[in-house]
Structures are given as structure tokens and as C-alpha cells.
């Protein structure tokens, strides 16, 4: 009787400490289908049950992130939508989360620190995470929940980073039928269609006007200047590196410029610099040519013409000074050692 009791006790302990915590693939699939994005949330009460092995040939990918503005994790914000795209790509081809070439399944989970004022998720404490984002993959027959592999997250952005993550998942799981499906961006197609339609219509209805516009020196000068300003403001750099629009500061504020960084920038920095350079160029043109044009067409016979010219020139010079001060402020933010600031205009740009 004692022998039978001991055997039963050992069997019960072994089952309850290891397999009982594990979830079947069907249960994981039900949890994934309950989520709108097919991502299983790792709650404090259930994350151990979800991640604990064995998983019946199921690999589980877990993202630990913190999108709270107070944290200031710009990479977390970037990875948020990229992770959604990766998960959607897998489930679009595999609605049952199972590979077409094998019995292997892949599920995706996530725990997010959205409000630092509340308690830190237990999953963060359990895995002793000191930084985010972190990407783990749990194998089906690992000895314990702590036996997992880390998927490195590169500094590349957009599709390149998503492809690298998918490639890492394929290597760990030996699943070959995992492809990235990027959502179709209809904006450039619709924009190109509308512009083409309007251009063809104008050429058909107003051919003389369109040819006069095309042959206009002013139009070509404006377009050439705008192109040069965009290039010197790192527009091409943004297109090549696919830089993020803006950053998040330590207090949750929006960052327009990367301090002390001449080699890196946010995309919005290009927009600000185009505005500054474009305004300066326009003001110089108005100062040199515009005032004369206004005088000859609006007040050619006015006795106080020179007085009006002086007022307009003074306003142009004042605005040139203000925008040039903004330009030097940007240089000061990018390099605090820059010794020639004109005005303290740093507040709008930080």
C-alpha cells in the first residue's frame, strides 16, 4: 500500500511540475484566434502556462516591449507595427498556425509595459529583463521555461528588420514556408493616378497654358531650388535608411532632433530643415527681386515709394534673421559646441 502511494505521488508530482503547465497546440490556437491580431497576451496569471514546455511541436515567439511614452523606447514603437506584420504574414498563409511542410506550429505572444505607474508585468521580473525590446523563442521540448533562445533585433528598420526576424525564426524552427507579406500601400498609386489624370486633362483642355508653364524659367528655378534643398536636408538619407519620423524623450516628449548626432537623424528633421532653407531662399528672392516687382506694379507713382520699400526690406531682413537664428539653433542642438547662436529658439525644436 505504501509502495503504491509513493508511486502515485511521484507520478503526480512529475506531471504537475512539468507537463501540466504546458498548453496544447489547440489551446494555443484558440487563444491566438481570440486576439484580433493573433498575438497571445502574456498576462501575469497565464504567461508561465503559455510558455512552459512541452508544446507539441509548437514554437512560441515572445516579444517583451514597452511602448509607454515615459519609457522613451523608440525601437519599441517601431517594432510594434513590424511585429504585427510578421504575425499577420504567418497566419495569412497558415490559419491553423501549422507549417504546410511539417507538423511544426508557430505562435506569437507579447507582453507590453504600457503604463509604468502600474506594477511591472510579472513576465519582466520572471525573466529578469533589464532592457527592451527583447525577442525570445521557446522550443517545443525545452527542459524548462528558462531554456529559450534570443532573437537579435537589428538597428535596420522596416522590411529589412522584419525579414531578419523571420529568417531567425525559420532557422530555429526549421520551418521554410514563412514569408513576409507587406500590406499594400495604395497612397502612391492613387496619388500617381490622380496627378496623371489631371495633367493629361490640362494638356488636352489648356495646352497653351501648360506649355507656357513648362517653359517658364521661374517654375524650373523653383523646382531646381526645391530639389537641391531636399537633397542637402538629407531626404535621400531618409529614403535609404527608412528613418523613423520622430523620437520620444525621457519624459515622453516628442523629439525632432537627435542631440549630439551629425551622422543620424529623424525624418522630421528633414522637413524642418526644408522649411528653414526654403523660407530663407524665398525671403532672399523677395528682398532682391520681389520688392522691385511690387513697386513697379502696385505703387509706381507713390511719393512714399522709397519709404514702403524700406519697410518691406526691413521686414524681410527681420524674418531672415529669425530663420537664420533657427538654423543656428539646430546646429547648437546637433553640436552643443557650436559657438555662434543668434537667438534662443531651441524650445520649439527639442
Curated annotation (Swiss-Prot):
Residues 1-22 form the signal peptide. Residues 29-171 form the Thioredoxin domain. Pathway: Protein modification; protein glycosylation. Keywords: Disulfide bond, Endoplasmic reticulum, Membrane, Signal, Transmembrane, Transmembrane helix. Residues 23-182, 239-273, 328-350 are lumenal. One of its GO terms (molecular function) is protein-disulfide reductase activity. One of its GO terms (cellular component) is endoplasmic reticulum membrane. The keyword Cytoplasm does not apply. It is found in: Endoplasmic reticulum membrane. Disulfide bonds join 73-76. InterPro entries: OligosaccharylTrfase_OST3/OST6. Residues 204-217, 295-306 are cytoplasmic. It holds the Pfam family OST3_OST6. The chain crosses the membrane at residues 183-203, 218-238, 274-294, 307-327. One of its GO terms (biological process) is protein N-linked glycosylation via asparagine. It is a multi-pass membrane protein. Component of the oligosaccharyltransferase (OST) complex, which appears to exist in two assemblies comprising OST1, OST2, OST4, OST5, STT3, SWP1, WPB1, and either OST3 or OST6. OST assembly occurs through the formation of 3 subcomplexes. Subcomplex 1 contains OST1 and OST5, subcomplex 2 contains STT3, OST3, and OST4, and subcomplex 3 contains OST2, WBP1, and SWP1. Present with 4030 molecules/cell in log phase SD medium. Belongs to the OST3/OST6 family. Subunit of the oligosaccharyl transferase (OST) complex that catalyzes the initial transfer of a defined glycan (Glc(3)Man(9)GlcNAc(2) in eukaryotes) from the lipid carrier dolichol-pyrophosphate to an asparagine residue within an Asn-X-Ser/Thr consensus motif in nascent polypeptide chains, the first step in protein N-glycosylation. N-glycosylation occurs cotranslationally and the complex associates with the Sec61 complex at the channel-forming translocon complex that mediates protein translocation across the endoplasmic reticulum (ER). All subunits are required for a maximal enzyme activity. This is Dolichyl-diphosphooligosaccharide--protein glycosyltransferase subunit 3. The lineage of its organism: Eukaryota, Fungi, Dikarya, Ascomycota, Saccharomycotina.
